[in-house]
Amino acid sequence: MEGFKLIKVLFATSEANPFIKTGGLGDVMGALPKELKRKGIDARVILPKYSAIKGELLDKLSFKKWFMVPVGWRNQYCGVYQCEYDEVIYYLLDSEFYFHRNGLYGEGDDGERFAFFDRAVLETLKEIDWCPDIIHCNDWQTGMIPVLHKLEYSKDPFYKNIKTVTSIHNLLFQGNFSADVLPELFGYDYEPVRNGSLEFYGGMSFMKGAINYSDRILTVSETYAKEIKTPYFGENLDGLLRERGYALKGIVNGIDYDEFNPSKDSLIAKNFSVKTIEDKVLNKLALQKELGLPINPDIPMISIVSRLTNQKGCDLIVNIANRLLQRNVQLVILGTGDYNYENHFKGLQELYPTKVSANIKFDNGLAHRIYASSDIFLMPSLFEPCGLGQLIALRYGAIPIVRETGGLKDTIHSYNKYTGIGNGFSFTNYNHNDLMHVIELALETYDDKEIWRSLIIQAMDSDNSWNKSAEKYKELYEELIK
């Protein structure tokens, strides 16, 4: 087509499903590029080649080339591997020194590891002779790519016309390090700290660099984009985000409808759809048997699939647990996190063995079965940039109870008993009594089977696929490269 330009986008990320993931970022990086590819964008992904990547995926990789990457005063080996998965090209950057570790994050040299990765991403482009129109960075781990590009690489004609975008998936994690990182790892003097563009409370911040130097800043929901411009949610970067508000936009995440599809999901006991909702209860019966809970199709099953942390509202749940368990309910928990919460939920199982199943682990198959079996899904987060759990719950007909924050506010529409419209229940104040009140309202509604069926239909009919969101990303890219 005359005048048609294929937009080339490189997603730089520290994790991507199916190769490796620790949370929502990995899910997004596995699904969004695939959807953009369907919309005619040449979307590719670059990430570290961690030793934890599964063997069957490693077997798909082909070695392209190697080169040395300057990290301050020294040079480090970088190998480039490539594979195609779901029609998307992935580049994995190999460095045994930096990425052959037990975990992805939390190492003492994380600053150096991702300083290497960020420069290696830019160096790789010239080495493989592929120049994207846009480098789309994600969270602090790729935050120095826009900085390196603006201060250094844009002077090279090869890189000159590249635009940079950064998505903030969670502003809480910022990549804050000593200011000595600049000369030690990037070969710069202290000027970016002195002029304030990277300075953060006496040190330097990868995230602040990304916010200052990216051409566009995105968050993963419209409400979170507004929230992070306020002191309560802004994590000491709210002033800068207000200043750069003209470049800030929120686009809500979707979920991968290929992976989360109750009508085809091989991980659940009985497939069902919005047309065969009556089959959903067979999953509940199978899960009750699997977890050793009393088998009863009528008892409301309430679930939590989450990291067990304050951010996820676990303190509220702990406060109401005994009151909740006086009722005729079953509570199923899956997740790991804060040691105190893990112990508390294990203690609840000992205290209420016929009502509580506490699974302190991560198990993807069990997560699917819990979503498919649950009647109610709890997600009372203190803050939630987007949240994927509530979207998966909707897909499987588990009615979410959420706090109105971030992406939860954007995706869950509280049930109105007068109009009959809604796909979940919500509350505003971060208060355990308010949470208990809305759970009681949901349980009261559950007793009316006709209304509850209508709620399930509205939940399952909610469109939370990547289709709409990917269209908004495409529009942003088109506007950026005009």
Swiss-Prot record:
State the top-level EC class: transferase
Give the reactions, separated by semicolons, that this protein catalyses: [(1->4)-alpha-D-glucosyl](n) + ADP-alpha-D-glucose = [(1->4)-alpha-D-glucosyl](n+1) + ADP + H(+)
E.C. code:
2.4.1.21
One GO MF term on file is:
alpha-1,4-glucan glucosyltransferase (UDP-glucose donor) activity
Q: Which Gene3D superfamilies match?
A: Glycogen Phosphorylase B
A Pfam entry, by short name: Glyco_transf_5
Q: Which UniProt keywords apply?
A: Glycogen biosynthesis, Glycosyltransferase, Transferase
Q: What does the entry give for GO biological process?
A: glycogen biosynthetic process
Q: Which residues form a coiled coil?
A: none
Q: Which domain of life is it from?
A: Bacteria
Please state the pathway this protein functions in, per its UniProt record: Glycan biosynthesis; glycogen biosynthesis
Give residues annotated as binding ADP-alpha-D-glucose: 21
Function as written in the Swiss-Prot or TrEMBL entry: Synthesizes alpha-1,4-glucan chains using ADP-glucose.
Q: Which family does it belong to?
A: Belongs to the glycosyltransferase 1 family. Bacterial/plant glycogen synthase subfamily.
Query: What name goes with this protein?
Result: Glycogen synthase
Q: Which organism is it from?
A: Clostridium perfringens (strain 13 / Type A)
